[in-house]
Amino acid sequence: MEIECHAKVNLTLDVLGRRPDGYHEIRSVMVPVSLHDRLVLEPAEEEIVLESRPPATDRLEENLAYRAAALLREATGCSRGAVIRLQKTIPVAAGLAGGSTDAAGVLTGLNRLWGTGLSDGELADLAIRLGSDVPFFIWSRPARVEGIGERVTPLPVAGPLWMVVATPDVPKSTGQVYRWFDELADVGPRPDAGAMEAALARGDAAAVGRALCNVFEQVMLPRHPEIARLKEAMLAAGALGAVMSGAGPSVLGVVPDREAGGRLLERIRPLSRDAWVVRTLV
């Protein structure tokens, strides 16, 4: 069984507050994009085997794809094994949810391969135990994501959008980004999720560009001017709008079409470690 595990970008991201349990309430408009990892699942007797290229840098028990397989087996009582072959393209710790999408692909794929029969809702209940972005990928379509990531509401969209996604060479810890945000005395501009959802429903790329907003930029851009320079370069080169995705450091720039994306890509390539022209999935 072969599965494409797609990256996501956040068109809007707002942090509404910190809960007593330490988790943060968020509201985000998220879309999957054509950039993807490739996952191959094969049945095995009992053992769960993970093969990743390039090789995974974390310990096996900490790898999200492996943890997803182990969690599904534990939750369903299944005793079967699997060989998980993962070809990585999405950069790690980049604000594109590369680990989360792989975990969701393992959950949905092994649910079919093993015949465990869980519904999408039941898979999403397992997914939130792996990470806040994982439930979104059970459906992997444009959505409003709320709570700690467990509330996923699909959104109507008129069609695909084109954009350039670029990742500068900036180290990042998502936990640290949240801690910096908690220290803000005053949060600046917040996203208008309603405006973004309306723009997506109309297929209005220019309006999508105007509505892009991520509150994490307020703590990341001052500390990492490379991200700010990349965003400014996208806007100067003609992007309809640009914003950091997730907790960064990746930046997306909305463009009118694929050709404009190719031109923008060449302009900003020197400022990024990785960059792609992508379209959103609907």
From Swiss-Prot:
Associated pathway: Isoprenoid biosynthesis; isopentenyl diphosphate biosynthesis via DXP pathway; isopentenyl diphosphate from 1-deoxy-D-xylulose 5-phosphate: step 3/6
Keywords, ordered alphabetically: ATP-binding, Isoprene biosynthesis, Kinase, Nucleotide-binding, Transferase
GO terms (BP aspect): isopentenyl diphosphate biosynthetic process, methylerythritol 4-phosphate pathway; terpenoid biosynthetic process
Catalytic reaction list: 4-CDP-2-C-methyl-D-erythritol + ATP = 4-CDP-2-C-methyl-D-erythritol 2-phosphate + ADP + H(+)
Transmembrane segments: none
E.C. designation(s): 2.7.1.148
Residues at which ATP binds: P91, V92, A93, A94, G95, L96, A97, G98, G99, S100, T101
NCBIfam families named in the record: ispE
Alphabetized PANTHER family for the sequence: 4-DIPHOSPHOCYTIDYL-2-C-METHYL-D-ERYTHRITOL KINASE, CHLOROPLASTIC
Similarity section: Belongs to the GHMP kinase family. IspE subfamily.
Entry protein name: 4-diphosphocytidyl-2-C-methyl-D-erythritol kinase
Native source species: Symbiobacterium thermophilum (strain DSM 24528 / JCM 14929 / IAM 14863 / T)
Organism taxonomic ancestry: Bacteria, Bacillati, Bacillota, Clostridia, Eubacteriales
Gene of this entry: ispE
